[in-house]
């Protein structure tokens, strides 16, 4: 959410930013917000003037009564009562205006970083760099669920009977591999200086609206019936929520947390073979990282965060590349975002395995996450988040890139201690 003062003073910048994000339907909101802001300030001024006049007039009542001027005192009382009624009327309108103003402000997108390429959607994202050499083996790489089935490692039919589409049972070595990836990711991030965190897996609506747009909320979140609670779609929301309504001395920043959690999302593709299996599902696990920092440090932390993901994948010999998300692919709260994609030998192309985002002060402004400077002045922090690894998608990349012609799957050195020392997985069928 933008600062209303910024919108008031820079309406054309805000409108051009909306055009750059190809959201022209929101242009009228800028003028509407400015009108509501003007009305809100005028109401406050009138209420303040009325209260001052009422206080001044009220003092006359006692003096008039002492002088025996009862009739004049009664007239003054009527004036005071009329002022009070007008104040109540204006206060009610002020509440309505402020609610409408906030509602519209939360729909206007954040100002994107000048370095963000302008484009309509993810097809116009820009490749930044490749890490590792993509390999296409001289044998056919099966679909990831077919590989898993060779190890009796997945049962989607049973999961479908239990929970419906978008769920799975992982079994045996594949389930162990999944857990090994998470354990390694946890230790990897702790070694990078992040504090390990196990957060709540449900959050209240004020936290949900503080960390994402209404559109994202509708598309992603499962609401608990009869409760002001939502299942988290990612642990970054719960971790950022930890700092709601806080004021942190700037010398105590940055706050760097990493968390493993299950994630629950309504989204699921309806078409296309790549939507089968564990690529896009309702429930999955993820190792996430967040940073709460001073504004001048957020760009530096942004680069550190996405590099963590690249480094993690490279320890498992999986080629990856980074993509700069274009303006139209950025969610409304994001200032800048980079996707990390892993190489798929089967598809002979890269696919998304993680995303790193700088939210600027958008989440902090909504959640009142503030910093106190050495001069005692307070300002909003910047927040960032990044995926270290989401094991379901990592399993796809891992199995495809480590599969051998005879069906064995090699286990990189980094994971072996979490797999009981195993150097490979041998298919059972």
Q: Which residue ranges define each predicted feature?
A:
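TRNA-recognition modules of translation machinery and tRNA-sensing kinases, especially anticodon-binding
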Residues: 27, 130-429
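N-terminal alpha-helical targeting/anchoring segments
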Residues: 1-134, 149, 153
